[in-house]
Amino acid sequence: MALADKRLENLQIYRVLQCVRNKDKKQIEKLTRLGYPELINFTEPIDGLSALHLASISNDTDMVSFLLKLGAHPDVQDHMGCTPTMRAAELGHELSMEILAKAKADMTIVDNEGKGVLFYCILPTKRHYRCSLIALEHGADVNNITYEGKPVFLRACEEAHDVKDMCLTFLEKGANPNAINTSTGRTALMESSREGVLEIVRGILERGGEVNAYDNDRHHAAHFAAKGGFFDILKLLFAYNGDMGLIGMDGNTPLHFAAMGGFADCCKYIAQRGCDLKWKNLEHKTPRVVAKDGGFKAASKEIRRAERTAAKLAKTGAKNPNPLWALRLHDWSIEHETSLRNAFKFVDRGDGVVSKDDFVVALEERQEYATSEQLLSVAQMHEKSRGGGVNINEFFKGTKYLSKSYVLGSFGPKKKKRGLGKKPRKGKFVLPLPICTIPENAFPRRPDGGPPYYMIETYQNVSDSHRFNRDHPPEHPIQDDSEWYIDDPSRVFANISFITKAGDLASLKKAIETGIPVDMKDNTYKTPLMIACASGNIDVVKFLIEKGANVNATDNFLWTPLHFACHAGQQDIVELLVKAGASIDATSINNSTPLSRAIESCRLDTVKYLLDMGAKFQIENRKGHAAMDIAKAYADYRIIDMIKEKLDNLPKQADNQKMKGKLPKLKTEGTDVKKEEETLSSIYTVPAITEEKKVHRDSVVYLNSLITSGFTKKVDITFIPKRIWSPEATTAELIRKRELRRERFTYEVDFEDFMMPFQKNITEKAQALEATLKN
């Protein structure tokens, strides 16, 4: 079509495009009538878009119909060679595409890369599938090939898992089952096998797809199916005369790929169906070595078993009881069981048995893998007596002419045998660790039947968002009259721990003002101060300490807030808690101190601060490990040197003191147990909730007191607003808060995979250990 290259033409086409966006039909009609001839089909000079392109992209069916009536051509192409139909198909606009198809849009046009409209329909939505149906109904080429040599059917098979119905439709409409990408050598069968879609693989093979074609790397469909562990596809490929022993350019057979993934059933099947078990790839590894290197014991065991069988058959005079033609006949008969049973019905004697001759004739007409002599030998194996015939059910089982481990029924999960047998050996008793939660009945309920008190009401700053926001709050309570025309929102309750972790100070302040204790424990025994210390939220920690939170409160594991702060590696919070009176040597249920938690997190500054504040580093936990033992276990040499220096600075014992015996331990077992029992018993107590006493305003005593106090003579002109705007952090303050978080937690805090110091330390050491073991 005409390309606008002059200034006036540019202005007019841009004006038309703007009118299309604004849906100004009158102006479009006027420009078409008074402007340049064929202006409706002009394209803008940058992307080459016409008016019909824009209408199709926005799925404005009314505008598409209007433009077509004005003479817009449905096949105008942009700079990429795309028509409005292609643009509509790409976005799944089926309504616009249907209108364009009725306007006789040419569905065989290709873009600058040789892609037809069907290429733009290959996306995993129902709308794109319906667009492909519209294109096929109006003459789209199902065998369209790009200039690089990629057919549209092969492109769909690359996404077969998501567009299965579309691929099957392409096959039904006559797509070439042997579609091949000339640049890579990949076929549609290879791509559908790689995706693991059995229905498409079956459809391609039924329509004559070449099963043993291979790509530029000499990989064929069995390689891709084995790599993904698709056992059903491997069975299907072998049933259609697939070669399980083809060797790729990298020296890998399908068995190598199955061993790489540890697919035991696939390894067993491929090993039985003619693959070379001793073949080495370019890395000089056999399939069994590949499975062993990957740590797949089951796959390695199956390959080893097949190697033993192959070694026995390699001896002179040994006869193979499971020849390849018999295995292929068995797999083919299972794949075509329905059609074979229908064929055998016509010659059935009435008891599920057919004569030997009829059996041979029926199979000889339908397959070419076994000769008539071989089929006759199979029939004779099924005959119990001369002229007894072949039982159809036994033939499909395959156990009469194949070993039991070679038939398809031997694959898959084994069924448990019923009956008496040996009792299984009892394993070592493991005490189950219960999930420690406070019972719901231990929490007092609200008088109005609401949730437990650890579920607090969230604060909602309800106001007219069109007038006020966090950067432009109301200057005076009288200015904000939103309460008079905005409905009150419904009450929303959230766990106090979630509120604390999110740093919602407004909701916490509201809860404390309404009588919720500042040390209210949630159903996992954690107080808000513990949660704030664990998440590293110093603002919430300061707020809770100001409100009188207990800095020595314990959970069910006797962890204090200082334990959580040291475990999270938050130096500033540790200092804040110690200044507020936190016990620096508080022991948990396994006698671990906050110093132990700081060492586990490998936080040198926190460890140094605790030692400078007088933390006892000789205290041992239940396992008898002191601070030095824990530091060695977590392999932080900086902390080891620091503790060693402290140990060296301890005063040495005199000789006469050594003769008196060992020094008394810093802890005694009896007092420790007693302390634990007392602490554990107090864990289950939930703080009492103080209810406000409601004054009965209709009481005679109350009204009489008002009269005597002269309240009725006073004129109160105080204005009390219904709702007061709660100060919110401005955008600048939120940005500054994010900057501070990055300074405290590093830049990684903005990513989803951010980990606190302890978790990060453990993960890094585990990954390093895993890498060492692999090498």
UniProtKB/Swiss-Prot annotation:
List all membrane-crossing ranges.
none
Entries under InterPro entries matching the protein: Ankyrin-EF-hand (IPR052801), Ankyrin_rpt (IPR002110), Ankyrin_rpt-contain_sf (IPR036770), EF-hand-dom_pair (IPR011992)
Ranges of the ANK repeats in the UniProt entry: 47-76, 184-213, 217-246, 250-279, 524-553, 557-586, 590-619, 623-652
The record's keywords, sorted A to Z, are: ANK repeat, Repeat
Quote any Pfam family the record assigns. Answer: Ank_2
Query: Would the keyword Protease turn up in this protein's UniProt record?
Result: no
Q: What is this protein called?
A: Ankyrin repeat and EF-hand domain-containing protein 1
Its gene? Answer: Ankef1
